[in-house]
Amino acid sequence: MTNKTITLNLGPQHPATHGVLRLILEMDGEVVNNADPHIGLLHRGTEKLIEHKTYLQAIPYFDRLDYVSPMCQEHAFALAVESLLECSVPRRAQFIRVLFSELTRILNHTLNIGSQALDIGATTPLLWLFEEREKIMEFYERVSGSRMHANYFRPGGVAEDLPEKLLEDINKFIEQFPSKLNDIENLLNENRLWKQRLVDIGVVSQKDAMDWGFSGPMLRGSGIAWDLRKSNPYDVYDEMDFEVPVGKNGDCYDRYLVRILEMYESIKIIKQCIAKMPKGQVKTDNPKLTPPTREKMKESMEAMIHHFKLYTEGYDVPIGETYKAVEAPKGEFGVYLYSQGGNKPYRCRIKAPGFAHLQGLNFMSKGHLISDVITIIATLDIVFGEIDR
């Protein structure tokens, strides 16, 4: 009797692939022998498009990469441009950027855990967590005018100061959010079915995690406490007191726990940001980067011309190259910029954490059932906006 393997196409229209992922599965019965991901179905040429835009016009492209956590990607680009310009950022703007980066982390992890539970067959966590995500999206809308594609961070600060009472409302949200998170933990942490589907599934050793270039919860779930907010702090993260949660076994369950614990740490950071939030400007005082105020434009024709030229022609960035990375919710999100002295980047290279994580899907899936592949895809926390770019 001969063993005959079958080939199964999973996706790209399958809801559990979290985007336009096409998987070619080679299977022996229900056991996966090989998983070959086919990517590129959402490729939009983002890096090339950025080369034809000014530095200000390039920011909205970063919202549309990992569209689940947009502000963290804006943060990386803003840091890279600031590095080339050697410009300082007002302290209030730094606190606002850290505050919204951590709100974005909660926004990302709530979706990941909710959709992961839904993939396995639990509907309640998704409904509860979407209720909390809606509140964060309202904060996005109040500060930027948009629920998702915020276009809020700027080289040299942020677009606008916080509206009145926003900090009070964020504080109310983070006071009640731990109890909601505790409800999710009570539902899932010791749930027999949840643990049967996650424990010892998709195990990644510390060596494998390093060899495959994993970062974020995928790396920390394997027990490696590497977090750019600690190892290479940016803005005011060096003033924040927080822990880096790590797992022990490197399986899907540990990665779930790491994301839960990260949300508690994000709450701690947000509380510190609100308590320490200084008064002052939210944009650099460099007139080359900052548009004139409406009052000045009503009084001065030069201010009006300056405003017009800033948004149509942008500003020149000195010749040089830089790489800046942030600890995005999915891992290390990096931006390499090369400037030839003009008002547009000569080259912009984007390093997306999900790209490296997806490459590890094959070795994580081997020997598991097809139903476990769905669990592994969910724990990778992939979004094809950033993978295909």
Curated annotation (Swiss-Prot):
Subcellular location: Cell inner membrane
Organism name: Rickettsia typhi (strain ATCC VR-144 / Wilmington)
Family according to the record: Belongs to the complex I 49 kDa subunit family.
UniProt-recorded name of the protein: NADH-quinone oxidoreductase subunit D
Superkingdom classification of source: Bacteria
Reported function: NDH-1 shuttles electrons from NADH, via FMN and iron-sulfur (Fe-S) centers, to quinones in the respiratory chain. The immediate electron acceptor for the enzyme in this species is believed to be ubiquinone. Couples the redox reaction to proton translocation (for every two electrons transferred, four hydrogen ions are translocated across the cytoplasmic membrane), and thus conserves the redox energy in a proton gradient.
GO CC list: plasma membrane
Topology versus the membrane: Peripheral membrane protein
Enzyme class, spelled out: translocase
Predominant cellular place of this UniProt entry's protein: membrane
SUPFAM superfamilies: HydB/Nqo4-like
The keyword Nucleotidyltransferase is annotated on this UniProt entry: no
InterPro entries, per database record: NADH_Q_OxRdtase_suD, NADH_UbQ_OxRdtase_49kDa_CS, NDH1_su_D/H, NiFe-Hase_large
EC number in record: 7.1.1.-
Catalytic activity annotation: a quinone + NADH + 5 H(+)(in) = a quinol + NAD(+) + 4 H(+)(out)
Alphabetical list of NCBIfam families matching this protein: NuoD, PRK06075.1
